[in-house]
């Protein structure tokens, strides 16, 4: 292990007051901060890139146990290191002097908070799953090792990864390509490899989302999902990765799911509106203590998914949510209350006072508080002792070996689902018309094809974001070959941040909802014109069942990340890999990790 037993181990053994214990059980976000601003907290969009004195003082005064960083907090290497060092300095000023858990969602692929030009983000879990039949857990290990080393160099000591949800529901709006596979055994093996690699690189891992978020059609950011599996199916599918990884190599943390599982716990809780409802897993003693700790034997630290998500916040106020969570036996409440300005600091003070009152009146269990604190303190003795170094970070983030690995994974994942003699692109197919979800993806694939083609290609592109059907039809008529791509389902809140982004996503989703019908109509037109057509699934491959029958060939990439670098060039490892396969420079070696009707 690369963790260094820190000098904080002694501090961890010093008895803490109940107030300090409560603070240690909180992980706050400071995504935005507007200081003295009088605007409503929810309207604040000033990125917090340096730690203001009042937030430093709050961390010290309340012995806050952790902080989670978002894309707004991590803008460049020097700034990130300055921020993580400042956060740890604030923790050092607390009475306990326990270090902070500094966490981030850097799963890779669609969920990656650090600028893709700086850090290596890779093409995500489902692309790793596509390599499993030929490569086993090689890419899972190498990718987690690279991400772990990059985070460690920045002073980030917890990665909320890997996702070990088994994506058995094609309509899952929030997991889909964040899952390795629909096969629980494959998910287990790849998740285990990542846990070992993250922690060997000096970063605590957090398996998520317990007891499983793979068979839902509701995103817990926007609603409360319910899974009605019987206990046998839960054991064989949802719980299997957690159970096996806990036995083989227990992760530092496990994250909860805001999901109702009646077969695991059908007891009721009265929410803040006075209504009775089945307990979400996050608030279930039966699930989080009896099942996870007593049956599965997990002795590490548990952390909630963000408590500001609608799956919790629509039903419980911050104090009630925290009390129910702690009484379920969960160790850390993640993002229980937003702090966006000085007025919110006052609100946080009231929140802490109410938690203290809950202890005094036995609404909170003192014995559970002490047990939880012992687990947190024990885990914190594993945190690295030294401060982050800019020189080490500069030589680690996005270094050539990590970029090569990123490109290798993208190529190894490309899956040929169908090919009726269309691929590789024939020499007589010189005029190619692309149909892409937006202009950036047009540019990315155009650039990749032009870069790697030995022949002079004439390329044009229809962006489905805004197009004239007559112009698109003319371009299709003139083309020797049609290459169409789509990404489904649309982005979820977790991919670009969290609950602060839900409104933006709803507006974006309205525009995206018309794209499948538009693409289908254009492919049907191309078919009527007798054109050779290639369809590329850029995300979850289930959409192949819709567009595959209209195409002569089908590829899946599981990723559509587009990077715009400082030279304003548009690129992305998935597009480079696709171009190489389309042009016959490389073979498609991947396999579908999920069942697709085609």
From Swiss-Prot:
Residues in the signal sequence: 1-11
Residue positions of the active site: 305
Job description of the protein: Most active towards p-nitrophenyl-N-acetyl-beta-D-glucosaminide(PNP-beta-GlcNAc) and diacetylchitobiose.
Recorded family membership: Belongs to the glycosyl hydrolase 3 family.
Reactions catalysed according to its record: Hydrolysis of terminal non-reducing N-acetyl-D-hexosamine residues in N-acetyl-beta-D-hexosaminides
Enzyme Commission designation: 3.2.1.52
Entry protein name: Beta-hexosaminidase A
Pfam families: Glyco_hydro_3 (PF00933)
Enzyme type, top EC level: hydrolase
Temperature characteristics of this protein: Optimum temperature is 37 degrees Celsius.
């Amino acid at each position: 292990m690369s963790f260094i037993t820190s000098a904080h181990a002694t501090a961890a053994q010093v008895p803490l007051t109940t107030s300090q214990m409560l603070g240690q059980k909180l992980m706050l976000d400071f995504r935005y901060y507007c200081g003295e601003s009088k605007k409503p907290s929810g309207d604040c969009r000033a990125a917090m890139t340096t730690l203001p004195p009042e937030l430093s003082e709050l961390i010290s005064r309340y012995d806050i146990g952790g902080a989670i960083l978002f894309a707004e907090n991590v803008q460049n290497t020097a700034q990130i290191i300055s921020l993580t060092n400042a956060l740890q300095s604030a923790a050092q000023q607390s009475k306990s002097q326990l270090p902070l858990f500094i966490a981030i969602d850097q799963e890779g692929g669609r969920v990656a908070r650090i600028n893709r030009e700086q850090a290596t983000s890779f093409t995500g879990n489902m692309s790793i799953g596509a390599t499993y039949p030929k490569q086993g857990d090689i890419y899972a290990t190498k990718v987690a090792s690279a991400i772990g080393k990059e985070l460690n160099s920045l002073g980030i000591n917890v990665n909320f990864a890997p996702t070990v949800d088994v994506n058995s529901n094609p309509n899952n709006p929030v997991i889909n390509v964040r899952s390795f596979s629909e096969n629980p055994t494959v998910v287990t093996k790849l998740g285990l490899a990542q846990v070992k690699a993250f922690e060997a690189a000096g970063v605590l891992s957090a398996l998520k989302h317990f007891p499983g978020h793979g068979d839902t059609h509701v995103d817990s950011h926007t609603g409360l999902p319910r899974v009605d599996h019987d206990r046998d199916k839960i054991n064989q599918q949802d719980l299997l990765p957690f159970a096996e990884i806990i036995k083989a190599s227990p992760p530092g943390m496990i994250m909860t799911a805001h999901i109702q599982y009646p077969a695991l716990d059908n007891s009721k809780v009265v929410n803040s509106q006075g209504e009775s409802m089945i307990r979400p897993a996050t608030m279930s003693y039966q699930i989080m203590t009896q099942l996870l700790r007593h049956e599965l034997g997990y002795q590490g630290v548990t952390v909630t998914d963000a408590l500001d998500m609608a799956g919790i916040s629509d039903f419980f106020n911050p104090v009630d949510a925290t009390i129910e969570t702690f009484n379920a036996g969960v160790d850390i409440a993640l993002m229980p209350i937003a702090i966006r300005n000085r007025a919110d600091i006052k609100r946080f003070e009231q929140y802490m006072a109410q938690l203290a009152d809950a202890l005094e009146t036995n609404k909170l269990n003192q014995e559970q508080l002490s047990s939880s604190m012992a687990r947190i303190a024990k885990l914190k003795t594993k945190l690295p002792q030294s401060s982050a170094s800019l020189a080490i970070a500069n030589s680690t983030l996005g270094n050539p070996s990590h970029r090569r690995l990123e490109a290798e994974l993208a190529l190894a994942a490309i899956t040929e689902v169908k090919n009726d003699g269309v691929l590789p692109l024939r020499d007589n197919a010189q005029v190619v018309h692309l149909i892409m979800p937006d202009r950036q993806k047009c540019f990315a694939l155009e650039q990749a094809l032009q870069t790697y083609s030995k022949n002079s290609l004439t390329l044009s592109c229809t962006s489905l974001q805004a197009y004239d059907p007559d112009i698109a039809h003319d371009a299709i008529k003139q083309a020797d070959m049609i290459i169409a791509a789509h990404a489904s389902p649309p982005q979820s809140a977790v991919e670009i941040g969290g609950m602060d982004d839900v409104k933006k996503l709803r507006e974006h989703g309205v525009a995206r909802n018309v794209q499948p019908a538009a693409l289908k109509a254009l492919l049907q037109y191309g078919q009527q014109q007798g054109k050779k057509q290639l369809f590329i699934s850029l995300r979850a491959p289930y959409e192949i069942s819709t567009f595959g029958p209209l195409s002569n060939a089908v590829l899946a990439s599981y990723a559509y990340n587009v990077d715009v670098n400082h030279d304003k060039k548009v690129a992305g490892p998935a597009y480079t890999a696709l171009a190489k396969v389309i042009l016959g420079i490389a073979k498609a070696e991947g396999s579908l990790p999920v069942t697709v009707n085609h």
